[in-house]
Amino acid sequence: MEEFKKYFERDSYWQQHFLYPLLFQEYIYALAHIHNHGLNGSIFYESGEVLGYDNKSSLILVKRLILRMYQQNFLIHSSNESHQNGFVGHKNPFFSQMISGGFAVIVEIPFSLPSLIEKKKKEITKSQNLRSIHSIFPFLVDQFSHLNYVSDILIPYPIHLEILIQIIQSWIQDVPSLHLLRFFLYEYHNWNSFITRKKSLSTFGKENPRFFWFLYNSYVSEYESVFCFLRKHSSYLLSTSYRNLIERTHFYGKIEHLPVVCSNDFHKNLQLFKDPCMHYVRYQGKAILASKGTSLLMKKWKWYLVNFWECNFSFWFQPYRIHINQLSNSSFLFWGYFSIVLINPLPVRSQMLGYSCLIDNTLTKKLETLVPIIPLIGSLSKAKFCNVSGHPASKPIWTDLSDSDIIDRFVRICRTLSHYHSGSSKKQSLYRMKYILRLSCARTLARKHKTTVRAFFQRLGSGFLEEFFTEEQKFLSLVLPRTSLASGSDRVYKERIWYLDIIRINDLVNYSRLAMELCTGNITKRIEKRSKIAFLFSTDMLKCSCSGS
């Protein structure tokens, strides 16, 4: 990385043509393998292992790939030649993984270097706790209790391939790399192996995680850059024609003349987006837009966003993907929690000159974060820890492991879910979840030793697997003051605790996300309108490009 920084600092002109030659360097593919291995395990070599490749022969394959890339010219390539010769790796999934992984590494260099150089100049130390998923919940607890409405937005996808390339072109000026990206995407689209209606994009995301997230983050950063600008300058937006605002070409040039246009031509229109208290949170494939304004203001934002995606990204965004809820009357889904603002009466005693009176008209708002038991049971059932009714079941696939390994796996799962849902206002769901995992572990061990669960507990005693229930108390006793634990474990389970070391969502929580959406009833209405809509963001990202290109 130090070598890259020196290269960039020498001459800024070479930044435009610096990326493409890196694609022919062997160490780029080694970096791609390391990053993919750390991101999702040994995903980079999954297809290679299926085809009979191993790590020893990977270096030979990389050299063979580079040699073929030297022989094939991506910049001048007719459609007839592409059908005759084909793109490098179109018959070899391992080659396609290497190309996409290497390309993802080199295109991230222009984004990472400025931040590193700027950080070195300013010497600003940033807390790593901000990466935690739980770091957003204290903000929601403090802010959302003062807000009135929230819009639950399902971020639209996919966009056309050419528009996606144009978005990346606004950030990367390396023309050969853009030609390679365009050729790579369109060739995969033509072979029906990269974008098809039969094969979901989730497979591509698993095999090429770094490249997949680069494409998605480029799209998200594009719309958020425009959206955040409009939010910051909302006091100047006086119901102007949005079609003049959201065109990508000369966008910032038009903004300079925006106040003049607004004052001269739009006196009769109402102010659209004047709201000093607006909060935006994005997570996975969804976003939340909360406001202290009125229902009319939220509806204006909804239709603006619908037209924004239609005009700026050239595809239809269904209005029912944005659902407006009043915080005091309905709940919204967020990172595996049901969140709702409850209005609680607060009695206040007033005393003056010996006389006292009780005033019970004071109302307080509090954001409650709840963990519904039905989606949790559904996720545990999908993982074969119980049935759909919540009755614990054994894990036959784990009976070949040792007793300590079986117990360690169950304890690890229980610890992960307990920590993730420790911010729940009511902990009854956690008690039941631990009960299911405890009995599932006992049934698995009993099945391994060919005995009954009752006989197993009688032999080991009632204290068997007690760590399922006592581990969190032991941990909190080391962190929290002794005074906070003086009243026992009941006091601990009534408090909401947010862990700032959780940087990824658990698979069981991910499984329960769809079930949680079905439980609310809001998503159920959307299913009745259009049953073929895709709920999970990672399954269908670039689907529209099949019909649009």
UniProtKB/Swiss-Prot annotation:
Keyword vocabulary terms for this entry: Chloroplast, mRNA processing, Plastid, RNA-binding, tRNA processing
BP GO terms, sorted: mRNA processing; RNA splicing; tRNA processing
Gene: matK
Pfam families: Intron_maturas2, MatK_N
HAMAP family documented for this protein: MatK (MF_01390)
Transmembrane segments: none
GO molecular function ontology, one term from the record: RNA binding
Family, per entry: Belongs to the intron maturase 2 family. MatK subfamily.
UniProt-annotated location(s): Plastid, Chloroplast
One Gene Ontology term, aspect cellular component: chloroplast
Species of origin: Albidella oligococca
Designated name of the protein: Maturase K
Function: Usually encoded in the trnK tRNA gene intron. Probably assists in splicing its own and other chloroplast group II introns.
Top-rank taxon, per record: Eukaryota
